[in-house]
Amino acid sequence: DPRGEHAVVSTGAWSTGSMAPLTFLENKDAGAVWAFQVEHNGAWRWEVGNNTVDGYFAVSGPTNINHAWTKKLDPNECFTTVPASFVLASTQQEAIANLTQYRRACRRVDSTTTQPRIIFNDYMNTINGDPTTEKLLPLISGAAEVGCEIFVVDCGWYDDSGDWWPSVGEWLPSKTRFPGSKGIVEVMDAIKDAGMIPGLWLEPEVIGVKSPVAQKLPDSAFFQRNGHRVVEQERYILDLRDGSARKHLDDVIDRLVNDYGIGYFKMDYNVSPGSGTDYQADSVGDGMLEHNRAYLDWIDGIHRRYPHVILENCSSGGMREDYAQTSRFQVQSTSDQQDYRLYPAIAATAPVMVAPEQAASWAYPQSSMNAEQTAFNINTTLLGRFFLSGYINRM
């Protein structure tokens, strides 16, 4: 940079979509290593450079130059920046250990829910978003037989049309996928009867453009720019600064926990709404920042109401693996990588970003694999939180 700086920037709502909000600086002469992390679930920037006095290092959340963020302060009004933290060590390995110690100490969730449990999820290289009672019951039996403690029904459980991407948002179970008088309760009861905790996939922050909820909620419940709702890949984005948006999601969580006994939610986030919303905000970046903070407060509210419930931060396979999120979620999905041969590199480096017991790296053995392939596959998930998929009922 002609101004003598090196900057790394992340834009939009995927805080780890391209780069990690984490860096290491090493002074070899002094034998010192500093590790810095930006603790924010949105846009951020860090830079290192020289000024007229000395070298410097700066970390920040959204900025004007990169993220269209400005904030007007009236006299005596205050603004709090996004948090950042740093550790000092003599080596990078020691710095990572210090970060892990810090992350464990500052976790915001009930410690009884952070103990690793073996998780089975029906998605990866298995049902792939097409669950039915007929498909799930054999997998439930197989998962229980191998000692799984949590069984998660992934995406598709709410879909009657076969085209669920633009219609999500009500989060009501399908009656065609789960027929009979009990519907999805038959599946949830089977999971509980097998001694496992039932879990469901949710993408709470989006409402499909074809969803009935899109017409029920006011425009204020959604991201807007220039007086119009933001549309991203046939989805509207909920703005959790709005009371009606938050009430909608609180009602969804309350219903799923109380009616179906859900004890685990996999929270996904598969679209990024660009720079933000200008509705009731000083700038689009300001609207994005305040929504991100409102989202974290909503997550905190789930923990207050249901301290026993376990939350997984998926966010499109690790696209929001920042400490603002991971301090509030017991489980962090590290990737959606489908090739078991490519996953070990991800699993081995995941503890740089999260506490090892949070890092959920997929293992998806299949009956067609030989012993070496199966062992290679399973070993990947042993590096963190045990996270299993595959047709184990056929093995």
What are these regions (language model features)?
Residues 82, 198, 311:
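Hydrophobic anchor at the start of a short beta-strand
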Residues 175-183, 193, 215-375, 383-385, ...:
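Active-site neighborhood of glycoside hydrolase catalytic domains
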Residues 113-251, 264, 274, 281:
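Aromatic-lined carbohydrate-binding/catalytic grooves of carbohydrate-active enzymes
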Residues 41, 86, 125, 205, ...:
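Short, glycine-/Ser/Thr-/acidic-enriched flexible segments
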Residues 83, 123, 153-155, 267-269, ...:
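Generic detector of well-ordered alpha-helical packing
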Residues 1-103, 108:
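N-terminal accessory beta-strand-rich subdomains and adjacent acidic, glycine-rich linkers
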Residues 40, 77, 124, 157, ...:
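Short, flexible loop/turn elements at secondary-structure junctions
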